[in-house]
């Protein structure tokens, strides 16, 4: 056990966590083991003695891999359940956290020999168990090895949101579902409890994941089932045991079926507990509680019934300790933290997560933020944030981030954010007001890019060889205006679209598919479903690298991870000057007439050759700033210009895959 009086910088810097500037922090090293087969891996740990109050206790679980002995099958290649427990000398055994290992196939870009994936859990509610001497158990359910596990804890001194005054474990174990001879609800009987002294509120925390498969519904891993929380024999909640966002998992691509949604888990992701508020419970309250799963009779497979791994407990809280306080919880961007891999590198608009850690609703927050060792900007957010609630807040554009991308800067940089006032005044706890992160800047690209798209044969309606193809790409500016998109591609076709960015600034490429299987997904290699592929190039034909994206070979006969991004992919980039090439290359049979030119109060646009097609009309000044934009299907368009200063402007008319640009003069 080691104690520090500085920030958490050393603790999180290597992995890119947002770093706090808290009170004194005690760090405790726990397990550091190889997970070589199905087993319990126990480590005796000396924790703090409980004489100090902690604002927060964090558990960091770092997953990695090792080289298995020659001839070993499936080394770190399967999605196995990992349960993490604390076991006290008094006999308490409580599950602290849960995660599922990824399909970490060797040779894939996200899984080099040195790969590490951190998982961060807030275990503050269990601080009374994490004291003196206790054991931390990792239960690994794998039938092959190859993974490593490292657990350590950070005890951050200060005042927690609420004190935990008691804890009642209700249920724990793995229970088959759908067996008429042993209904699952037999294992979730009514529990009669009494809230301890000091209780002002109570919550049920339920860690549950479905595994295995029956014959018809693939229950429970791939089947969406529900349960009720019964408090005093009355349902206070009905919840589906389901996670619907596996296709946007930040740890991707993986070598298995990582895109499929599952029963409250995704491969390579931590498992979030399901939390239910229990109304009407206070000190001395006697109550009954149980969980009731929806009735279900399964047809067992050759491996039997599926089931649920469950751990449920009631946690009793005292009152909120602070009156007016906000906590800066996370920096979502800019950041290199792996859990924010899909959002980064981003543009010049930082985003943070804020928590109301007081009892007073928050209506305004003032922030200071900026790149380290540079001028800090100020921003005031106005809204409503209830006690103990969270919010994600985006800041206005930060000029220093623009400068870094404009210069093509490489390497890592530091970013800081700080809450400077809450509801117009200083809050009660300054130790939770600041965070910092490490980040890389968005890349600088040329103003003209070529998108080489080769489509497969899966139509957007799910049928083969029926147009349009299921994949879509879109380029937008930071105001959300569409610069160009290909959303009506034919199956089995090739497109080379040259796109000119209309002005200097940040842009975003978004790739998407309704089936959450990227433009290519390896399970279909060799089948009748043919893959697609996208490569982004400059005008010389040189590939422009996209973060976390593997380009295909020239013939699409290669296998593996190319174009495997799940539901959606984003790439931010910056251009220093507007492009020019697509104006002529994309000309079509339709035309636009712009008059008067010069103009004073308004510009009239007359469109001929097309009818009813949605288009975007933009007006860009000589500095590359978009001063007017609208979407329309009209053929006679009026653009107001009376409020604009005199000068030369570019009028841009985007209609689907085609683009027209006219120079106009505004004279006063």
What function would you assign to each model-found segment?
Residues 1-25, 341, 580-583, 597, ...:
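Bacterial Sec-dependent N-terminal signal peptides
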Residues 19-326, 332-336, 340-346, 357-360, ...:
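Extracellular/secretory-pathway and virion-surface proteins
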Residues 100-113, 243-244, 248-283, 293-300, ...:
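Loop and turn regions of beta-sandwich accessory domains that flank beta-strands and are enriched
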Residues 375-408:
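Intrinsically disordered, low-complexity Pro/Gly/Ser/Thr-rich segments with frequent PxxP/GP/PP motifs
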Residues 401-441:
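Terminal connector regions
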Residues 477, 585-595, 599-668:
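C-terminal outer-membrane/trafficking sorting elements
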């Amino acid at each position: 056990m080691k104690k520090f009086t500085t920030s958490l910088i050393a603790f999180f810097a290597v992995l890119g966590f947002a770093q706090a500037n808290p009170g004194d922090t005690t760090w405790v090293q726990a397990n550091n083991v190889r997970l070589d087969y199905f087993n319990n891996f126990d480590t005796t740990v000396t924790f703090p003695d409980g004489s100090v109050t902690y604002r927060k206790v964090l558990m960091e679980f770092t997953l990695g891999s090792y080289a298995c002995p020659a001839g070993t099958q499936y080394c770190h290649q399967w999605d196995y359940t990992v349960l993490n427990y604390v076991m006290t000398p008094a006999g308490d055994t409580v599950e602290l956290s849960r995660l599922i290992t990824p399909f970490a196939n060797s040779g894939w870009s996200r899984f080099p020999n040195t790969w590490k994936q951190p998982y961060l859990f807030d275990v503050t509610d269990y601080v009374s168990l994490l004291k003196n001497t206790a054991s931390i158990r990792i239960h690994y359910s794998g039938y092959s090895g190859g993974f490593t596990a490292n657990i350590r804890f950070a005890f951050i001194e200060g005042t927690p949101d609420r004190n935990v005054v008691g804890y009642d474990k209700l249920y724990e174990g793995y229970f088959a579902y759908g067996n008429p001879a042993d209904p699952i609800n037999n294992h979730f009987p009514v529990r009669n409890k009494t809230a301890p002294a000091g209780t002002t509120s109570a919550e049920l925390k339920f860690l549950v994941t479905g595994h295995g498969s029956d014959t018809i519904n693939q229950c429970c891993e791939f089947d969406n089932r529900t349960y009720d929380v019964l408090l005093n024999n009355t349902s206070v909640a009905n919840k589906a045991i389901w996670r619907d966002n596996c296709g946007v998992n930040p740890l991707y691509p993986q070598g298995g079926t990582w895109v499929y949604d599952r029963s409250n888990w995704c491969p390579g992701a931590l498992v979030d507990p399901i939390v239910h508020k229990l109304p009407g419970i206070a000190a001395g309250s006697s109550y009954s509680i149980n969980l009731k799963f929806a009735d279900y009779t399964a047809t067992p497979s050759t491996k039997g019934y599926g089931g649920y791994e469950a751990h449920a407990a009631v946690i009793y809280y005292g009152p909120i300790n602070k009156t007016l306080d906000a906590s800066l919880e996370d920096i979502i961007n800019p950041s290199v933290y792996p859990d924010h891999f899909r959002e980064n590198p981003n543009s010049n608009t930082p985003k943070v997560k804020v928590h109301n850690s007081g009892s007073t609703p928050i209506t305004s927050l003032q922030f200071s933020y900026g790149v380290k060792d540079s001028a800090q900007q100020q921003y005031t957010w106005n809204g409503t944030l209830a006690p103990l609630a969270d919010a994600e807040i985006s800041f206005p554009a930060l000029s220093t981030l623009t400068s870094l991308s404009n210069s093509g800067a490489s390497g890592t940089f530091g970013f800081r954010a700080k809450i400077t006032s809450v509801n117009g005044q200083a809050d009660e706890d300054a130790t939770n007001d600041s965070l910092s992160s490490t980040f890389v800047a968005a890349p600088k690209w040329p103003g003209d890019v070529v998108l080489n798209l080769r489509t497969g044969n899966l139509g957007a309606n799910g049928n083969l060889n029926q147009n349009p193809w299921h994949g879509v790409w879109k380029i937008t500016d930071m105001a959300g205006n569409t610069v160009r998109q290909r959303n009506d591609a034919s199956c089995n076709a090739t497109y080379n679209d040259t796109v000119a960015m209309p002005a200097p600034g940040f842009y975003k490429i978004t790739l998407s598919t309704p089936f959450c299987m990227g433009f290519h997904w390896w399970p279909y290699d060799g089948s009748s479903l043919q893959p697609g592929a996208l490569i982004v190039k400059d005008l010389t034909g040189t590939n422009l690298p996209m973060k976390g994206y593997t380009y295909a070979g020239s013939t699409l006969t290669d296998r593996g991870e190319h174009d495997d991004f799940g539901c959606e992919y984003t790439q931010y980039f910056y251009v220093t000057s507007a492009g020019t090439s697509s104006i002529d290359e994309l000309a079509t049979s339709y035309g636009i007439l712009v008059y008067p030119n010069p103009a004073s109060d308004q510009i009239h646009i007359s469109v001929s050759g097309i009818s009813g097609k949605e288009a975007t009309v933009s007006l860009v000044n000589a500095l590359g700033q978009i001063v007017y934009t609208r979407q329309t299907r009209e053929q006679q368009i009026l653009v107001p210009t009376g409020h604009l200063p005199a000068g030369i402007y570019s009028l841009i008319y985007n209609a689907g895959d085609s683009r027209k640009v006219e120079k106009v003069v505004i004279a006063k």
